[in-house]
Each structure stands twice: as structure tokens, then as C-alpha cells.
Amino acid sequence: MSSDSNDLDEDELLQMALKEQAKRDLTYQKPPSSSARKPVANLVQQPRQQKPVAAAAAPPKKSAAAVRKPSMDEDEESEVELLSISSGDDDLEREREIGGSSGGAGRGRGSDVREKGRARKEDDGAWDGGEPDCWKRVNEAELARRVRDMRESRTAPVVQKVEGKAPAPGKKVALTSLQSLPRGMECIDPLKLGIIDNKTLRLITESSGSPSKAEKVDNTLREKLVYFSDHFDPKLFLSRIHQDTTAADLEAGALGLKSDLKGRNLQRKQLVKDNFDCFVSCKTTIDDIESKLKRIEEDPEGSGTTHLFNCMKSVTSRANLAFEPLFERQAQAEKIRSVQGMLQRFRTLFNLPSIIRSSISKGEYDLAVREYKKAKSIALPSHVNILKRVLEEVEKVMLEFKGTLYKSMEDPKIDFTSLENTVRLLLELEPESDPVWHYLNVQNHRIHGLLEKCTYDHEARVEILRNDTHEKAISDAKWQQIQQNGVSYSDTASSNENNAVQVDLQSVEFPSEEIDILKGRYIKRLTAVLVHHIPVFWKTAISIFSGKFAKSSQVTDTSANKAEEKVTEARYSTHSLEEVAGMIRKTISVYEAKVNSTFCDFDESCILRPFMSDAINEVSKACQAFEAKESTPHSAVVALRKIQAEITKIYIQRLCSWMRASTEGISKEETWIPVSILERNRSPYAISYLPLAFRSVIVSGMEQVNLMILSVKSEAAKSEDMFAQIEEIIISVRLAFLNCFLDFAAHLEQIGADLSQSTSRQDNWKNGYSDEHQEEPSANTYGSVIDPHRRLLMVLSNIGYCKDELASELYNKFKYTWLQSRDKNEDSSDLQDLIMSFSGLGEKVLEHYTFAKANLIRTAATNYLLDSGIQWGSAPQVKGIRDAAVELLHTLVAVHAEVFAGAKPLLDKILGVLIEGLIDTFLSVVEENRSSDLRSIDANGFCQLMFELEYFETVLYSYFTSAATESLKSLQGTVLEIAIESISEAVETPGHNRRPTRGSEDTVSDDKQSVSADDLLALTKQCSNELLQQELERTRVNTACFAESAPLESTPPLPKATYSSFRGSMDSPSRNYRGSQSSGSPINARPRRR
């Protein structure tokens, strides 16, 4: 309680002191010693009208405080200085010292402070970089560093021994004694638990070792960990410094910190109590200083200065009024003497403009330049305007002269000697721009102008051609209208006609060939501009930059030859030769844009004409001209080669696209006219004109492509950059070649599919012709094939011709275009892929044809078995081949003739498929009608049917496939089975049997006698032996077409083999037919096919 009462007493005392201080008179009173001061010496001058700057007298504490917190030492020094100002004598001495150092003797301190405030901005620029004389020149960061170094250089005090109780066992003992260390190394932990390493900011205790010095702490973290910093973070301090400290130690440290704080508060209060008078004195001193500063600001100049200045000003004005006439006359005399001397001194200068003009008009350029340089060397007074005007006239004359010289450099026919003299004169005249570079720019612009002129002329010619074409179209339209009306028009009518007849510009077809001719001439003219001007331009640049101006002159004379010997090595321009090369590259870029746009506009219909190839040849010639010695820079040659490769690539790509487009075009124009055997080079395929047109397209396009690739390959040997482009071009050509074949195959497949659909929609067929096609008007070309089946055969022939002849021929002819970049195995695989594609396509179209013919054959086979006028259950005796069999054979004869004439190489394959289908049709019809029309077959019917089947097999044997043979065996077995069943049923039910005919008496002697399979086969063999050869001779004319590949002498043994197979399955007479079905019966020899 006593401490609280003491605190209350101290606060009351402090409040009472402040109230007394507030009642004091704060006005400034001059000290008694001020009357004893010496008078102040002051120069008479105009008092400054500017307002006094109060801020100049105040020390710059605010700016410093805004940046950093001032140290205790600095605060003490500033307080001492302020206290010293309050005394009168010290103030006077300080003012004198400051006034003497600034050169203003006798000035008061207030005036000096004001002058400093005013002249602060003037002093800013006069600082020599030494010690700063004002606060804003102080490097505050450097000042803070120095203060920190001063603090760290001091030694840390020895830690006082902490009085306290003995620690409990297990607790960390606080440090009792530590050696004093440098301040920059360690500082004491505020909790008195150890020492904090200032570099690593780690706690050092008696039990722990020194932390690692390799660990570095950034400034941001240091500001948060230093406890006397403004940015101190207590949580971060405890988590880092005391991360290993126990809770008991932290509590003990916190208790010690609180007791220390309490002790310090007591000490502060005691300090205020003991030094209360000192604090009051300080407050009084501060108030005195403030009042003195305010007075200084109110009267900065002192008394009497303004009056003295006004008196002196009045005296000066009266003196000027008295002596003014004398001064004027003296000034006029001085001016006259000055003008006279100037005229005498610069008389040559006044004649200089006329002298220079005379020299220029006479062609004495060197004399004019010398006079000009002489005038430039004269040192003229800056205040004489007449001389300036004379020099301005000289400059005007020389400016016109320089313009004349620059104009002469634009002459395209200027020789190198004149050019050298012109450049030398311009260099002596010190032009604003480089004359040599001006000349090079002029020549470069001239080349660009020539290129643009070519473009303008080309557009004008194209426009004239379009107008002529349009006028011709109008006249043609008028003539057609006259012919339609049949009336002769008068002049008036013709004028009305001009107004009436209008032709749409879009409908007018402009002559693409003539336009392409103009485009070719345009590219040729552009290339000629480059070839004729770029090498000369480059040689001129080389001569200029090598210092040998006249050595590359193409227009030389004797004087030029003499000048060549005297030319010295010198550099005429500040630019480099690489910049000239950049000019040429830009020119070639302009040329490239024009050539590429024109080349892409060539009409594709004229692609085989020489316009595009001639343009490429022109660019190639330009490349060869550029490759001559010192003709152009290497970069220009590379750029032109690139242009050649690009337009060649465009041309080849357009050729490839033209081949594919032409392939599609000719595929839509199939005329169905078979070509002669000579036109197809004795090929067995009766092709149309379509494959030959395709061949013509491919050959025309690939020959042009081959020539272009060969030319590019020869140029690529000189440049490695073109190899990649050539490889890309070759790959695209190969793919385009193969795609053309695939596209043609796809078109042939579409044609075949369309023909198949047209045949499938037809309901009635009559000998291979549909009624629809029979009624087709004769609008087709004479000699064209109309029958859809024959057209399918023609498509098959076209496919076979492409597969067997055309693909290999064209591939072997043009494979060397891309063969070097590919392996031989890959090369052969391409051809095999083409052949496989056409083979697969041929199979598809062949299916369409055989399907259409199979319908005819099925109808004929059905008529043969069911509608031939014979009852197979009561057939007459076998006497030979029936007419129905011959009619059936005629169907195959017609097919044979059709295929032989249209696709002879496919004859065996087609007939083999059709015959196999015929046998399958027989088998299908027998199975379908087994319970109806063919449920009963007697012995004579069996012999007749088996005999005719053997006849078919003998005649068509050369086209029989293994599958057809197996089907025939199945058919024979089925017929045998039906016959045996029919005869067995007749024996079992004799009442229902018909009376045997006369022809059957030899076959069946007793109705109740059963007939075995061997007996039926024996009867069939007997008929075959007696009648087969005879029937073959009788129908030799009908079957002659089938005998071409298989002679008649080889046919008789064939049925024997068939019967032997039957006989092998019926060897045991004791076994009935049912038991033999599982042991080799021809019925189960092959699955039945519908």
C-alpha cells in the first residue's frame, strides 16, 4: 500500500509542475547582455521578397524519424545542441561562425537560417559527393549500418548472478557467470537462461555446445527474433530460441522478467522524483528556444535594411539621368568602330556566296568546297547578325549544291569514277547522312521500282486481255441474236442492240492459256530484273566497302583506268557489307512473294503446257547467275534456291493433284467402246479406252514430275539445305502415283457396282439381254457395248489389264524417281500391293457377273429337269441326247462366246464357277422337287438322266473343278437313290403300277423282281458305251467351243472313272443300297449345296 501511495504523490507533484509551467509567459525577452553586443555588419542589398521558410530553421528530425528510430546517442547530442542555443553568448558566437563560413559577414543567425532554407535547392546540385551538408544527402541505410557496427563493437556486460532459491532437481540451472564477449557475437537471453548467438540466433547454455556457424538467418527472421526490434514476435522467439527449454525453466524466466520489470518501474519513478527540478528546467529551456525561433521567422532581415536600399536606389537613378547622353554617344561610337573593323576583317566572307555560285556553275566543285571550308574555319563573333546572315546564305548555296550531288547519284548510268568524286565531295561537305549509303539505298529502291513496274505492266496486259475477251463475248452474243431474229439491223437498231445485249462478266470464260502466257512472261521479266541489277549492285557494294571504288566499273574509259591506279584503300561508309546483303535479301523476298503468288495462279488445265516449267527454268538460270564469283552474297543464293525448291514443289504437287483429278474425270467418261488389238498392244483383254486414257494421264504427269525432280536433285548437290525438301517431294510423288492407281481401281469398282445394280433391277432376261437395254435409244457412240453383262466383262478386262500389264509397266518405268530413297523390298511391296488391290477388285466384279449369269443358268437347269416334256417316272427308252440338254448347253455356249470375246484370260475361271453353279443347281432342283415332280424315276429315266449328265461332264470336262466333280457325284448318288426308291415302291405295290411300255420290257422282266444299284449302273454304262460317242459326233458343232482346250479323244475315259467310283460302292451284291450309304455312297461324298 505504501508503494501505491508514493506513486500517487509523485503523480500529483508532476501535475502541479505542469500547471505552473503552463502559466509562464512564453514571449521571448532579449537577455540583458544583448545591449553589449557589437553592431552587425551587413551589405546593402535588395531585401528578399520571398516568404521566410520556417522549415529551414527546424532540424530535419521528421524525415529521419520516418525512416529509422534515432539512437540514444543522437538524441543526447541534439538535446545538448538545443540547450546551447538557449544561451545568449553561445548563440551569438554560433551565428558568427556560421555567417563567416557562408561569406556573409555581419548576418544574424536568423538570416543565415533563412538563407539556408532558400538556397537548399541551389545547394543540391553543388554537392561534391563528400560529407553531406544536409539531411536529405544522408545515406540512412549506411548510417544505420554504422550505428549497428558501433553497438556491436562494444562489449557485453557481465551477467549478474541471479539470486534465488536452489533449483529443484531435474530443472535447468540458469547461467550464473559468463565471460564478457564481443557484442556482435552473442547477447543475453532476457529470461536469463543462457546466451543467444547473434549470428545463428540459437540459445547457448552451459550444457549445450556452440551452434553451427554455417547456419544463416535472413534479415526478416532476425527482425522478428531480436527482442529490442519493432517487429519482435514473442511466439516465434520462444519456438526457435527456447525450443528445447523446459516449461519449468520458462516459468522461472518469466517470473524473473516480471520482477525485473517491477524493479525498473520503481527506479524510473525514483529518477523522476529525484530530478524533478531538472525536468522543469528542460521544459523551460525548450519553450525559450521555440519562442526565439518564432521571432526569427517573423523578422528575418533585421531593422533598417530596406530604408538603406531605397536610398541607394534613388542615388543610382539620379546618376543615370545625368550621364545617360554621354553613355549613348559612347555606345554609338563603339558600334561604328566595331562595324568598320568587321567589314574590313570579313570582306572576303561577304563575297563568298557569289564566288561559290560561280565555281559551281563552272563545274569547279573542288574550288567551291575549298571556299566553303575556308569560310567555316573563320572564327566569327556570335553577336554580329550580318555575318550570320552571310553564312546562312553560304549554307543555302551549299545545301543546293549537296542536293545536286545527291541527285546526280540517282542516275542509273553513272560511272564509278564520277560516283567516287561525288562521294568524296559530299564527305568533305560533312553531310547529315552517309552519301554512300544514300547511293546504295537509291539503287535498291530503283530495283524495287523495276519490280513494281513489271507488276503494273502485267496487270495492265491482263486487264486489256479481259476487256478484249469481254468485247468479243458481247459481239458473239449480238451475232447470235441477229441470227436468231433473222433481221438486218440498221444503225439505230444496232445502237439499241448495244444497250439491250448485256453479257455477265462471270459467265465469260477468259482464255486461260493466254493468261498463263502473260504470267510466264511476268515471271521472266521479274527474274531478268534480278539477274541484270543485283550482281552489279553487289559488286558496287564490295568495291565501296573494300576501298577500291573504280576497280569493278563495267563502263570504263582511259581516265577511269588511270584513276584505278591511284585509288587508295579507304572506307567510304560507316555501314557494313552485311547491311547491303540484308537489302538484297529483302529484294529477293519481294521477288519471292510476287513469283509465288503468280505461280499459284497458273490454271491447272494448262499444267502440261510449258508455262510453269519455263518459269522454274528461269528461276534456275537466275540461281546459276547468282552463283558466279562476287555476284551476290551467299544468303541471296540460298534464298533464291529456296524459291526454286518451293515453286518446284508446288508444281509437282499440282501435277500429282492433276493426275488424281484427271483420273476421276476420265472415269466418268467411259464410252464402252472396245479398243483394237493393236491399241492394246496385243493384250488378250478386250479393254475399253479407259485404261489407255489413265495410262496417258499417268505418263504425261510423271514425265513432267521426273524432269522436275532430276533438275532439283542436280541443284541439291550444291546445297545441303534442299535434301530434306527433295525427300519430302519424292515421298509425296510416290504416294500420289500409288493413290492414282487406287483411285482408278475405286472408280472401276464403282462402275461394276452400278452395272450390277442395274442388272439386279431387271426382271426379265432374254439370252443375256434385258428388255430395258433392248429399248435403249441409239444415243450411245457407234460401236459401244450396250449389254450390261458385256460391260461387266469389259470392266473385268480393264481390271485384269491394269493388274497384269499396266501396273507393272508404269511402276517399273517410274520407280527410279523414288527408288534411291527406298529399300528394294519396300519397292517390290508397293507393286505387290497394287496387284493385290486389283485382284481383290476383280473378284468383286467377277462375283457380280457370275451372279447375273447364274440366274440364267438356274432358269435353264430348272427348265431342263422339270419343263422339258419328259416324265422321269415313265420315261421312254434312251435313244440319245435330248434337245433340252442341247438347249441347256447352248446357254453355256453363249456365256463362253461372250467371255471369250470380252475377257479371254478369265474364261476358265468364269466357266468353272458357272459349271460348278450348274451342278449345284441340278442338285438343288432335285432336292427341292424330290417329293413332287421328281419323286418317281424309273430305270429308263435314270438311264436318260445319267447319260446326259455324263455327256455334260464329257463336253465340259476341261472347265470342271474339283468342287464341281464332287457335286456331280452327289447329284448322281441322289438320282440313284430316288430311282431305287421308285422301283422298290413299284415292286411292292404292283396294282398301282402302270403297264410297262415297250421300251421298258428289256429293263424290267418281272414286276416283282427287285433292281439293285449295280443293275442300274450297268444299264447306264451300256447306254453310254452305245450312244455317247455317237452323240458327241452329232453335236460336235454345238460343243466345238468347249473342245478347243480339251480334244475329243481325251473325253471317253472320263465317264469310266465316274462309274468305277459308283461301282466301288456297290461291290457286294448281297448288300442293299441302304447299307451302302455309309460306306462310300456318292450321296454322302460331298455336302449338298443349294
Swiss-Prot record:
The keyword Transport applies. SUPFAM superfamilies: Cullin repeat-like. Residues 1058-1082 have a biased composition (Polar residues). It is found in: Cytoplasm, Cytosol; Secreted, Extracellular exosome. The modification Phosphoserine is found at S180. The exocyst complex is composed of SEC3, SEC5, SEC6, SEC8, SEC10, EXO70A1 and EXO84B. Interacts with SEC3A and EXO70B1. Binds to EXO70H1 and EXO70B2. Binds directly to B1L. PANTHER family: EXOCYST COMPLEX COMPONENT 2 (PTHR13043:SF1), EXOCYST COMPLEX COMPONENT SEC5 (PTHR13043). This is Exocyst complex component SEC5A. The lineage of its organism: Eukaryota, Viridiplantae, Streptophyta, Embryophyta, Tracheophyta.
